[in-house]
Amino acid sequence: MRHYEIVFIVHPDQSEQVPAMVERYKTMITEANGKIHRLEDWGRRQLAYPINKIHKAHYVLMNIETTPEVVGELETAFRFNDAVLRHLTIKTKHAVTEASPMLGGEKAKNLLVGAAEEAAAQ
């Protein structure tokens, strides 16, 4: 299996649907015996340039380990989801698990850590 970093941005009017979208993508990865090493919700941020007259969007970062076929399925899902404005998939040499420098590490909502803490609390 290969390691990938995926960033996708969602239309700001669809921000409330981001958790359901992330859950759907997580199941696609885990059903194919893939692993999610890092999953961060960066929230709504200013775009560098307007996309379809939209100036802000909701960002999500995923570092995963899976097969190229699953990555193709994910990219197809991104392409046919009208809420996803842009997506980028990069193949990496190794798994990245530390917090991203984008938000200074601790500000980022790490969805994997949050899920692990909820499971430990129950």
Curated annotation (Swiss-Prot):
The residues forming the signal peptide are none
UniProt keyword Ribosomal protein present: yes
Name a Pfam family for this protein: Ribosomal_S6
What molecular functions are annotated in GO for this chain?
small ribosomal subunit rRNA binding; structural constituent of ribosome
Q: What are the disulphide bonds in this sequence?
A: none
Role description: Binds together with bS18 to 16S ribosomal RNA.
> Under which name does UniProt file this protein?
Small ribosomal subunit protein bS6
